[in-house]
């Protein structure tokens, strides 16, 4: 009986082992088939399907290194970095020297700039395999992100020479040169790469990218290489019709060609391509912002509205994009629209946050933008009323009270404020001299300003292909917007500004950003419509760079009389409210630099009325100079200081015979310094 029992157990155990062995042998070929199919799909950049086959292979053979590597690589490409890291670590637990897993895991550490972790992975292997191209490329990528480009280039070039320039090293070298903005060497490297690897679609896409960047600052050369760029992109798309890089740079190509040829259909083609990319990659903010911009230009308002909202949801710290969305919304949407209302609410909230902060002056930018976006909002009106009252903007204060009274005619509080404000206006020098007209429902200012005139050019990007297509124009518009709030500066705007832009565009414009660059040879175009009138004297121009959320602007103020830049300075700010802060600093600096100048409006018995006042920075004890054709005649003291005009008594006898209406009046520089010192 015992022997029979032992035999029975033996046969059962043998059967189980035989079954497991057969199952394993049958499963292994099936797993290999899945891995093979996964690799094929992965080579076609179809990681979403490839990963399913790798996972299927793991179910059949959970120890398969190839299947785990496939899941890790595809997860990385799809942005599932935690899953990718898990499988790379599982591979390295079994095979610590598995180089594809080492380089893959290093790529994840690179995302977090964990350079020490990368060094721990690759340094021991580099000692053992100093000529391994994948390890050297991983090392170069780490050095590249650390900003050690020269070291990375040296190591890749040295190894490339030793190994007779293998394709993967040429590709890496092209990227390193590109990062260093050495576009000539980058092009030579990628050109050599595409000759050795003619079936790599990304190689051709990168080659087209380098060609565009190489010629960005030379519009004529950029135009001449467009056919080569198109051919190179087509080579890439023939190899991989869904290639992301090639499709994206075809958008840039079509935008440039459209602007060169004024071909709207070409821009519509760019719009259709970016439309597809934005849907395939819904978390890519650049795609959404670019689609919104093109939609605005093409009149596709539904698309523009949706994609501005989506882009701001992805990054609400993007100050340039927010300003662009506001410009679009003010121009194209009704006040009650969802986007415009959201933008107005944001500016209102930022104003409240900054109102009593260190940056309280730049907070006024938020208030003014909130007014433009939501002029009928009660809380905005309340804040504007308080602001006008505090800053002495009596006319704006009274006009806002008049509008509020129309809406609430029975409010005694409003009526009392209105009566008191009108009483003060009637006591002002502006009213007595006839420069204020008080009607039942409106106060009109008739003061003529003679303060310095300023034309603001678009700012030029310091880097090729700025992230924001309109950034240069937007920064110029933001500077103009802020300067218009400064009474002592007259900004060229409206019809005259548009006429000048039209003339400048005929002379020169950038075919990608459509910015109009500052050029001394074109400045005569500023006065074309003025004929014998006073010429525009001051020009604001400069460059900008937006990198990692930091807005940096290099500004120059050009004086056409002295034919030189009279001031050049830089300013930068990072993060939320960076745009208002930078723009406020620029405006204040321009206000300080420009002379305080006006003219004699009236000559009276004992005094003269001049077009300078508190708005121009004058104080009661300021001394003014009278000039004619640049020659100083004599000085005068202020007897009554108004908001926009003042009464001045010249300090010499017989002045009545010397002065005439239209003579220049300036606040001397010494007086300004003295005043500042006090």
Specify the residue positions occupied by each region the protein language model found.
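Short beta-strand->alpha-helix linker/helix-N-cap micro-motif
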Residues: 449-521, 540, 603
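Amphipathic beta-strand/beta-sheet edge segments enriched in Tyr/Trp
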Residues: 521, 528-575, 641-642
């Amino acid at each position: 009986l015992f022997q029979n029992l032992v035999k029975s157990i033996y046969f059962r155990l043998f059967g189980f082992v035989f079954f497991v062995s057969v199952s394993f042998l049958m499963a292994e070929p099936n797993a290999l088939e899945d891995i093979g199919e996964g690799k094929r799909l992965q080579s076609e950049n179809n990681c979403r399907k490839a990963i399913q086959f790798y996972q299927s292979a793991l179910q059949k053979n959970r120890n398969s290194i190839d299947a785990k590597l496939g899941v890790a690589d595809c997860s990385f490409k799809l942005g599932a970095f935690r899953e990718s890291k898990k499988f790379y670590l599982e591979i390295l637990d079994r095979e610590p020297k598995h180089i594809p897993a080492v380089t893959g895991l290093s790529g994840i550490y690179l995302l977090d700039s964990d350079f020490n972790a990368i060094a721990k992975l690759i340094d021991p292997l580099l000692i053992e395999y100093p000529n391994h191209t994948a390890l050297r490329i991983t090392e170069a990528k780490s050095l590249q992100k650390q900003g050690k480009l020269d070291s990375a280039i040296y190591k890749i070039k040295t190894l490339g020479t030793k190994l007779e320039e293998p394709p993967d090293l040429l590709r890496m070298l092209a990227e390193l040169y590109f990062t260093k903005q050495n576009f000539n060497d980058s092009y030579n490297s990628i050109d050599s790469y595409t000759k050795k690897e003619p079936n790599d679609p990304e190689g051709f896409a990168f080659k087209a990218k380098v060609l565009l960047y190489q010629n960005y600052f030379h519009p004529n050369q950029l135009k001449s290489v467009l056919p080569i760029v198109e051919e190179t992109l087509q080579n890439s798309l023939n190899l991989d019709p869904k290639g992301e890089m090639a499709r994206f740079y075809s958008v840039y190509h079509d935008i440039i060609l459209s602007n060169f040829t004024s071909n709207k259909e070409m821009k519509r083609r760019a719009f259709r391509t970016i439309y597809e990319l934005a849907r395939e990659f819904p978390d890519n903010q650049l795609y959404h912002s670019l689609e919104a911009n093109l939609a605005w230009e093409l009149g596709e308002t539904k698309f523009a509205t949706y994609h501005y909202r989506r882009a701001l949801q992805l990054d609400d710290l993007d100050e340039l994009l927010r300003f662009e969305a506001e410009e679009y919304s003010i121009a194209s949407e009704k006040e009650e629209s969802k986007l415009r209302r959201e933008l107005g609410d944001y500016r209102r909230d930022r104003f409240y946050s900054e109102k009593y902060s260190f940056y309280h002056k730049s907070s006024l930018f938020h208030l003014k933008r909130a007014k433009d976006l939501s002029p009928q909002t009660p809380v905005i009106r309340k804040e504007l009323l308080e602001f006008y009252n505090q800053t002495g903007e009596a006319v704006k204060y009274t006009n806002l009270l008049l509008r509020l009274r129309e809406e609430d005619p029975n409010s005694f509080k409003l009526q009392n404020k209105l009566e008191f404000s009108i009483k003060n206006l009637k006591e002002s020098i502006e009213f007595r001299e006839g420069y204020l007209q008080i009607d039942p429902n409106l106060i009109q200012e008739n003061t003529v300003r003679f303060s310095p005139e300023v034309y603001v050019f678009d700012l030029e990007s310091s880097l090729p292909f700025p992230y924001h297509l309109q950034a240069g124009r937007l920064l110029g518009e933001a500077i103009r917007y802020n300067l218009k709030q400064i009474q002592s500066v007259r900004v060229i705007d409206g019809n005259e500004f548009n006429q000048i832009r039209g003339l400048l565009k005929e002379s020169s414009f950038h075919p990608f950003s459509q910015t109009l660059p500052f050029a001394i040879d074109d400045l005569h175009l500023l006065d074309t419509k003025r004929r014998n009138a006073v010429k525009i004297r001051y020009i604001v121009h400069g460059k900008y760079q937006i990198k990692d959320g930091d807005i940096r602007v290099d500004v120059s103020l050009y004086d056409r009389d002295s034919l030189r830049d009279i001031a050049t300075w830089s300013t930068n700010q990072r993060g939320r409210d960076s745009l208002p802060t930078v723009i406020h600093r620029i405006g204040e600096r321009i206000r300080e630099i420009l002379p305080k100048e006006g003219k004699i409006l009236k000559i009276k018995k004992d005094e003269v009325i001049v077009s300078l006042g508190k708005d121009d920075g004058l104080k009661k004890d300021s001394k003014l100079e009278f000039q004619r054709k640049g020659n100083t005649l004599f000085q005068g003291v202020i007897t009554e200081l108004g908001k926009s005009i003042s009464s001045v008594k010249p300090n010499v006898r017989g002045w009545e015979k010397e002065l005439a209406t239209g003579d220049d009046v300036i606040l001397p520089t010494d007086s300004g310094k003295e005043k500042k010192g006090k």
